[in-house]
């Protein structure tokens, strides 16, 4: 009975993540339509995604400084955040006619999403023991991949107006908010003690070697991940156009397959591996494979479509397979009473890096072409692999040593 309830809550948390995060790349998937309707430039297209990332960072940093994820009932914070993300996306679909309106709304969407993804991690951790936490985080991150890729699926299934795509994503996020409010509950491993705000913990946690190495590994992973997700469809489209290949019409489906299907499967497999063989070897293996894909990407740019798709499936799976290991490792090494704050701070810094690479990739493409643009991402997984290889095999929490104060 207890096991059934645990599995049910995990599944519901993952479902809410898929629904709530479907708004993340909704505007990015609509870029081809917006180019003709708004005269959108590559820089403007980059800002449609980067503004979400910046909003996410601001929201996550604010949440971390206020210890919000540890002070508010997580299911309520999740529901309100998903509803706000839905409202901002719906407003963009109904009222936006250019970047002057779209970018502020995308920024606010990012702020709202800071209460969806990190809080989902906290809730998933509350329903997980250390022996299966990697698998649980893998499922959650697979939900992130599916939700993020969903707009590509909508675009790939037919020539829908971009406003319809945005409204569909907004509706899904609103449904996720209702589910979070009505049926999601915190698990038995959630520390429910009230926390006196201690913003210093955001900095103090980096003093511990295991936490620091885990974070560096995560930052290397993030240097690659979101820039790849943002510009993958452009990479595919440019290569197919150079080949004069009819498969260019199916760019959205290829992107969904690599990001959503392969990414989801890779997340679950990576989470399982982190439980079976350890966080460190699971993360290092994924980082090495995705780094190799970065280096090999120019050779597949104009490869036959079947070869390209197989390559992108491997890359899509490996680029996110290590995420569960990072989240799990941090939840096990950071102060257990402030795990929500630690995860939020880690995520905020990682997403700040994504703003840099999201802007740099199209700049590189303008200089050397899309064939070589993704070489820019290779240093991330290389640095991440080195950091994770140095991680102690059995890192432990530093709760007893942290300068944190509580009300009882």
Task: Name each model feature, range by range.
Residues 27-28, 210-264:
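Extracytoplasmic gate region of multi-pass secondary transporters
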Residues 181-203, 397-405:
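Flexible cytoplasmic inter-helical loops of multi-pass small-molecule transporters
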Residues 60-96:
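Conserved MFS/SLC helix-loop-helix module at the cytosolic interface between two early adjacent transmembrane helices
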Residues 83-97, 289-302:
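C-terminal ends and interior cores of transmembrane alpha-helices
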Residues 279-326:
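C-terminal transmembrane helical hairpin of 12-TM major facilitator-type secondary transporters
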Residues 60-73, 267-278, 365:
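Helix-to-loop junctions at the C-terminal end of transmembrane segments
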Residues 139-184:
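Helix-loop-helix hairpin linking two adjacent transmembrane segments in secondary transporters
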Residues 105-142:
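Cytoplasmic helix-loop-helix junction between adjacent transmembrane helices
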């Amino acid at each position: 009975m207890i096991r059934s309830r645990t599995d049910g809550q995990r599944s519901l948390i993952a479902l809410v993540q898929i629904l709530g995060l479907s708004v993340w790349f909704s505007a990015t998937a609509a870029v081809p339509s917006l180019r003709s309707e708004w005269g959108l430039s590559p820089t403007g297209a980059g800002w449609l995604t980067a503004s979400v990332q910046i909003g996410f960072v601001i929201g996550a940093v604010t949440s971390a400084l206020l210890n919000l994820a540890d002070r508010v009932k997580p299911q309520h914070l999740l529901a309100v955040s998903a509803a706000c993300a839905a409202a901002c996306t719906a407003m963009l679909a109904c009222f936006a006619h250019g970047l002057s309106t779209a970018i502020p709304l995308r920024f606010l969407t990012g702020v709202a999403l800071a209460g969806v993804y990190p809080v989902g991690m906290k809730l998933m951790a509350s329903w997980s023991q250390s022996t299966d936490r990697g698998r649980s985080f893998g499922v959650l991150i697979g939900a992130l991949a599916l939700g993020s890729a969903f707009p590509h699926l909508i675009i790939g299934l037919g020539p829908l107006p971009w406003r319809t795509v945005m409204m569909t994503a907004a509706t899904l996020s609103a449904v996720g908010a209702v589910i979070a409010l009505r049926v999601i509950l915190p698990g038995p491993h959630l520390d429910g003690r009230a926390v006196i705000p201690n913003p210093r913990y955001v900095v103090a946690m980096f003093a511990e070697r295991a936490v620091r190495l885990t974070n560096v590994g995560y930052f290397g992973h993030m240097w690659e991940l979101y820039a790849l997700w943002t510009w993958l469809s452009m990479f595919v489209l440019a290569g197919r156009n150079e080949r004069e290949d009819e498969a260019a019409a199916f760019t959205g489906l290829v992107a969904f397959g690599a990001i959503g299907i392969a990414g989801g499967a890779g997340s679950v497999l990576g989470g399982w591996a982190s439980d079976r063989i350890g966080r460190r070897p699971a993360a290092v293996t994924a980082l090495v494979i995705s780094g190799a894909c970065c280096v090999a990407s120019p050779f597949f740019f104009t490869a036959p479509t079947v070869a390209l798709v197989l390559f992108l499936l491997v890359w899509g799976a490996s680029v996110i397979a290590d995420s569960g290991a990072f989240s799990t490792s941090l939840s096990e090494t950071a102060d257990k009473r402030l795990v929500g704050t630690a995860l939020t701070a880690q995520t905020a810094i990682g997403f700040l890096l994504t703003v840099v690479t999201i802007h740099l990739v199209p700049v590189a493409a303008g200089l050397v072409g899309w064939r070589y643009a993704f070489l820019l991402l290779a240093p991330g997984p290389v640095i991440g692999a080195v950091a994770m290889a140095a991680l102690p095999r059995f890192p432990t929490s530093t709760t007893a040593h942290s300068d944190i104060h509580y009300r009882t």
